[in-house]
Amino acid sequence: MEELGAAASGAGGGGGGGEEHGGGRSNKRGAGNRAANEEETRNKPKLRDRITSFRKSATKREKPVIQHSIDYQTAVVEIPPALIVHDDRSLILSEKEVLDLFEKMMEDMNLNEEKKAPLRKKDFSIKREMVVQYISATSKSIVGSKVLGGLKNSKHEFTLSSQEYVHELRSGISDEKLLNCLESLRVSLTSHPVSWVNNFGYEGLGVLLDVLEKLLDKKQQENIDKKNQYKVIQCLKAFMNNKFGLQRILGDERSLLLLARAIDPKQQNMMTEIVKILSAICIVGEENILDKLLGGITAAAELNNRERFSPIVEGLENNEALHLQVACMQFINALVTSPYDLDFRIHLRNEFLRCGLKAMLPTLKEIENEGLDIQLRVFEENKEDDLSELSHRLNDIRAEMDDINEVYHLLYNMLKDTAAEPYLLSILQHFLLIRNDYYIRPQYYKIIEECVSQIVLHCSGMDPDFKYRQRIDFDFTHLLDACVNKAKVEENEQKAMEFSKKFDEEFTARQEAQAELQKRDEKIKELETEIQQLRGQGVPSAIPGPPPPPPLPGAGPCPPPPPPPPPPPPLPGVVPPPPPPLPGMPGIPPPPPPPLSGVPPPPPPPGGVFPLLSGPIELPYGMKQKKLYKPDIPMKRINWSKIEPKELSENCVWLKLKEEKYENADLFAKLALTFPSQMKGQRNTEAAEENRSGPPKKKVKELRILDTKTAQNLSIFLGSYRMPYEEIKNIILEVNEEMLSEALIQNLVKYLPDQNALRELAQLKSEYDDLCEPEQFGVVMSTVKMLRPRLTSILFKLTFEEHVNNIKPSIIAVTLACEELKKSESFKRLLELILLVGNYMNSGSRNAQSLGFKINFLCKIKDTKSADQKSTLLHFLAEICDEKYRDILKFPDELEHVESAGKVSAQILKSNLVAMEQSILHLEKNIKNFPPAESHHDKFVEKMMSFTQNAREQYDKLSTMHSNMLKLYESLGEYFIFDPNTVNMEEFFGDLNTFRTLFLEALKENHKRKEMEEKSRRAKLAKEKAEQEKLERQKKKKQLIDINKEGDETGVMDNLLEALQSGAAFRDRRKRIPRNPDNRRPPLERSRSRHNGAMSSK
């Protein structure tokens, strides 16, 4: 074993067995270090590893004995006799050591078990000779690198070690030296074993890519630079001719980009090598390699400001380089057939055709070349398969997708007389607006095509190269779904609103007609009773006619009892002053009483404020006293409610405000100009004008009759309307509804002085000019007879229609809801299903065998959780109905008015009707007791008589409809077994509406859950399918790698290129989506004609 160490180290030292092949004479340093040899002898396993890591550096004159493309079963026979080593070193090794080294040698050769088996069967002597020859060859490789130390000449007599190549390339050599180094490296990568390539690849790949990038970035490229680029590409191709190199290339982000940048149609040979490499990467690359490849091609195109596939098409145009045309077609086929998505394949193919391939196809078909014919046939066959698959997707629409006329007619026929047709027309019209410019117009269409492709291809995988552009990053799927759903919802809602409106109108008319009919029936019965009474008294039959009808108030049923204590405020006129506004009618709330905002009086305003602020006030939380401003002229006052210091809190916003920073003279000047208390002209008038305006100002403050608060409120009212007092009086007398408004009458009722004050003001009519404005207004209004009853009656008239419109829909909603509940068969079936499920679940309990249940239980169904706490009994019922009893699902639509009925309060409805009747009675009484008119403007009685009659009729109808509604609700109590007096309408219908809403939500959640489960199931199937396809692809890749005869796995690129050239790489990539033979559609009948690269279809 020591001699084995010496023999192995003799390859690097001067030991006794180093004569053969001159291997032992190259290392002088090891000859004088016996201690090191002894250390290596003690660590023989490590030494064996070192031995098997050596590689032979091949020269042009002496090829390596073990080639990677030969048959290893005949390796020993093909070894030249001169290289068979016969020395004593082979006799020193034991049989176990020889076998161990033999296994190491085969592993170094990257042989699989299938290739190792025949070699293991060889005779032991042959194995020993192979091991000794292998040791000698690796020793010679070290001698060549250490002794000669580099490249001796351009003939490449000697080569460098892998690390020396890395160092040489990093040293910055250029031109001829770089070319010689790269050529030597190419030979070494081609001839050395895989382990040498591995040692070089860890650092060498990055150095090679740096060299290529540096060469590509040079602005002035000489001929030698182009040669060096070509040599780098050749080195990369040789480096990739094994699995390790291929994986390293695919793992480096720069490699694909630099390869794409190096594509140059002017350098035919280099471009041929590059597109071959890229073609091989397309068909054997790992996951997402297509994304990286397209990204690199797109980025390179953007750097050169060109279409990304234009260089490939330019390569096809070079008729003088047939090998380049074949390689470009190989790349097109490899790239277009790689995606597993039909839309993406069509998108890539169309992009090539758009770049000029379509116009070139006829010319290429005329070239007689077997390799080119294979690639063209593959292109057409895959194109036909994709079009066939697209036709199946479009229900066998037979059309020629490459002909613009055919595509337009196909699209037009699809959209004709549909909702999408106007949008197509709008799109085409917008196309006509594109500028008619030779250069700009194609760019418009390019942008439009990119946007359309992103929208259309988004759901099935966006073209990955778009991430290198200004991408439209929108999820148009949800947008389109939302638009479609919104359009459907809007259309259905519009129809539903129209039908609902018509139905409500018809139902309201029916209810009113029934009420009128019921009223007339009662009248008939009353008259018949009276006739019977008269006949019983013996009155002769010749009665002049029926007695006159009873007075109007007594025509209807007896008035209901007075309202209960808690009812809302009644209509105006029912309660003595001050009357509240009508229920539901938003009166203008009284603002906080401000000081009189009329003409400012001479005394300093506001009186009584300054004395309060005379002393210093200590402000809380460290606040400082606000600055006191002194304007040059009197300013208008802002009527705000002041915050007192005691109202401040520590976190209030007022502590943080610093308004002083906005102080400036321009602001104050503008304020003085805009908001003075009097105009300039008034200030500049002479004493005569002052004397005229002065006395009244002093008398404004002198209230004779009214108190300050009442005067202030009246001032606010008069300032809001700014109408002459006589005009206000006349529109009230005339009951001029065009000028009157609800707010005006409400404010008058609210702020007008009481009758005693008005009577006193009437006595001051002679002193009218000396009175303040509120009292002047009081004097004018005091002349109107029965002013407050008149105002309350007018207010009732103005708000009557609004109250009718509030009461009538509530009655109709409850009436409809009662009828719907009784008529709904689907709701009955649902109750049946719930009763069944409940009795089953309650088996063995006191609630078992129930005959029914309280209707309020429906809202509690959701409280029963499932065992896994993920669902409820309500979800279960909704699912059962959805799957087996779909007719039950109609009940939410059949109970349409339950929601509106649940918002009706029976107490408020009754009180509103009572208030309406009381208002009508008061109005009738006022009309009866109204004094004769003293002015031609007074038309109160005239207008109120007709209104009273109409109001009475409307009320009678509403009262009858309300009575019918109560009867229906009482019958509903009997129907569902509940006490109508205990369970009010709002509670009953509210519970039903809540259950209806919860049921619909449960149904929606079930659908959503099923969709999620279906998505998960499809995702799982898709994942399994993807895994299966991945395994199949890996199997196909392995088949592609092993497609040649027996040999090691170092010829990966050679095998892939051969598969591409022969078309075998594309055979299993077609027809990715198998169809069921039973459901297969009949084949498309196409008549094909070759014209300009397009196929016509009939």
From Swiss-Prot:
Disulfide bonds: none annotated. Residues 544-620 form the FH1 domain. Residues 543-565, 578-608 have a biased composition (Pro residues). Pfam families: Drf_FH3 (PF06367), Drf_GBD (PF06371), FH2 (PF02181). The modification N-acetylmethionine is found at residue 1. Residues 1048-1078 form the DAD domain. Keywords: Acetylation, Coiled coil, Developmental protein, Differentiation, Oogenesis, Repeat. Residues 625-1025 form the FH2 domain. One of its GO terms (molecular function) is actin binding. Residues 36-52, 1007-1032, 1075-1087 have a biased composition (Basic and acidic residues). InterPro entries: ARM-like, ARM-type_fold, DAD_dom, DIA_GBD_sf, FH2_Formin, FH2_Formin_sf, FH3_dom, Formin_Homology_Diaphanous_sf. One of its GO terms (biological process) is negative regulation of neuron projection regeneration. Residues 90-463 form the GBD/FH3 domain. Residues 375-416, 490-539, 999-1050 form a coiled coil. It comes from the Eukaryota. May be involved in oogenesis. Belongs to the formin homology family. Diaphanous subfamily. The DAD domain regulates activation via by an autoinhibitory interaction with the GBD/FH3 domain. This autoinhibition is released upon competitive binding of an activated GTPase. The release of DAD allows the FH2 domain to then nucleate and elongate nonbranched actin filaments. This is Protein diaphanous homolog 2.
